């Protein structure tokens, strides 16, 4: 290993051991990993300190309203034009993009899967993405895709950016390190992270886990933001201070590297002679972040009835129609159940929205059996769903005293658009053939006579 590589490795290790973050959501941050690297009083000096290049990364049109205008200024060792050369076609056949109407024989229905098994071969994060559903059209920046991932090998000299959308990553098994152009995030199960559209990054494992598994929402539309609280007021749900954006960190590495790109559903790769993660300082509001789901402050019914699940929204990606989401990220965290003379689990429902669910930890209160950590369920537009027979009987007859629903964390990617199943998902060996039978015990109780049955 040459001296430059040793210094780069030492610098990366030292940086990783003291990861720091800046609190806040949508803030205009500033950070530098070398003193004086960040220009003061202007964005684009004639010459930057340390011989750096100034470059702007825009996440919105220049003329977007101030409240939705996103950009960051990066001060880097090389400009991004040096981070791509001639592209070659690449293939990741299990990562699909909307519109995707794969041919398969699985008919319409409510669906549930056990966890995707750990890979037998070596897979990086990029190689381990498996698309379950797609919705909308990435080329028109509408809709989303829901993926699962499994991997057991680090992206060492491989880097990736997604021009089709931002990536919301939800680890379920194994902590990961996400090294982006703008800093490093360590993310463990019960945390999430978001990598903005077009931002270069690589993913590695951390800790003792030999394989990592989780979920990804690829959001093609308007970026995720915090939902309006309405009458809830100024506090609760996901509070801005609990979102953490990494401080600047860079990788000064001179060796053959590969940059992979996803653009309008196709993959490309280019070879360069250095790391593209070379941003020494930056300022702006277009940035990655992480969030600990355990800091979510839930609200709920303190008298009777079960409120709509929208009260559990962590993030929402809006459309032009007010209150109609391109995709919502919703969680079902630990909480107290105290409603009186009320059926406390989620009620039976048919919905214009399409719901992709995963379970990070514990049990889900409407499905105590069959829906396991690492599992997936899909309840598509207007298909009925709700508690299974066991959960219904238990909740209908239990003594209604205050109960702490603990040791649980389920989530949902909910979109306005129908979610089309991929061939991979339709033919996955972990698909539960007997899922629909969970409602078989819901027998007729009506006999025409009044009274509680």
UniProtKB/Swiss-Prot annotation:
Subunit details: Hexamer; dimer of trimers.
Q: Which GO terms describe its cellular component?
A: cytoplasm
Q: Any idea what this protein is called? A: Homogentisate 1,2-dioxygenase
Biological process terms in GO annotation: L-phenylalanine catabolic process; tyrosine catabolic process
Q: Which gene encodes it?
A: hmgA
Its recorded reaction(s) are:
homogentisate + O2 = 4-maleylacetoacetate + H(+)
What keywords are annotated for this sequence in UniProt?
A: Dioxygenase, Iron, Metal-binding, Oxidoreductase, Phenylalanine catabolism, Tyrosine catabolism
User: Which Gene3D superfamilies does this one have?
Assistant: Jelly Rolls (2.60.120.10)
CDD domains, per database record: cupin_HGO_N (cd07000)
Q: Which residues bind homogentisate?
A: 364, 385
Cofactors required: Fe cation
């Amino acid at each position: 290993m040459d001296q430059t590589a040793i210094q780069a490795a030492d610098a990366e290790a030292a940086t990783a051991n003291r990861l720091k973050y800046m609190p806040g959501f949508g803030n205009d941050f500033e950070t530098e990993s070398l003193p004086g690297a960040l220009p003061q009083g202007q964005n684009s000096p004639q010459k930057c300190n340390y011989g750096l290049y100034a470059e702007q990364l825009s996440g919105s049109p220049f003329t977007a309203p101030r409240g939705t205008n996103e950009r960051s200024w990066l001060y880097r060792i090389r400009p991004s034009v040096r981070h791509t050369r001639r592209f070659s076609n690449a293939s990741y056949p299990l990562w699909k993009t909307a519109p995707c109407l794969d041919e398969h024989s699985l008919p319409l229905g409510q669906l549930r899967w056990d966890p995707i098994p750990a890979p037998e071969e070596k897979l990086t994060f990029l190689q381990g993405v498996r698309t379950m559903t797609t919705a909308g059209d990435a080329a028109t920046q509408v809709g989303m895709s829901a993926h699962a991932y499994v991997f057991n090998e680090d992206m060492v000299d491989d880097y990736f950016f997604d021009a089709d959308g931002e990536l919301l990553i939800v680890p379920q098994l194994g902590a990961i390190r996400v090294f982006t152009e703008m800093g490093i995030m360590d993310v463990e199960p019960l945390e999430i992270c978001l990598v903005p559209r077009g931002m270069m990054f690589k993913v590695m494992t951390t800790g003792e886990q030999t394989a990592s598994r989780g979920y990804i929402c690829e959001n093609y539309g308007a970026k995720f933001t915090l939902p309006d609280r309405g009458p809830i007021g100024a506090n609760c749900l996901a509070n801005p201070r609990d979102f953490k954006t990494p401080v600047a960190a860079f990788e000064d590495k001179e060796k053959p590297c590969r940059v992979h790109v996803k653009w309008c559903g196709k993959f490309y790769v280019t070879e360069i002679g250095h790391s593209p993660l070379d941003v020494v300082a930056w300022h702006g509001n277009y940035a990655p972040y992480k969030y600990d789901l355990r800091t979510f402050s839930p609200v709920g019914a303190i008298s009777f009835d079960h409120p709509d699940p929208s009260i559990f929204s962590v993030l929402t990606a809006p459309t032009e129609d007010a209150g109609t989401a391109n995709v919502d990220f919703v969680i079902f965290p630990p909480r107290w159940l105290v409603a009186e003379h009320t059926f406390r689990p989620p009620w039976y429902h048919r919905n214009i929205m399409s719901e992709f669910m995963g379970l990070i930890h514990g049990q889900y209160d409407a499905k105590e059996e069959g829906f396991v950590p690492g599992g997936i369920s899909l309840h598509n537009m207007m298909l009925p769903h709700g508690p299974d027979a066991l959960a219904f009987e238990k909740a209908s007859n239990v003594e209604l005293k205050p109960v702490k629903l603990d040791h649980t964390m389920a989530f949902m990617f909910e979109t306005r658009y129908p979610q089309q199943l991929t061939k991979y998902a339709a033919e996955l060996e972990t698909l539960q053939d007997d899922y629909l039978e969970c409602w078989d015990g819901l027998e007729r109780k009506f006999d025409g006579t009044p009274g509680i049955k």
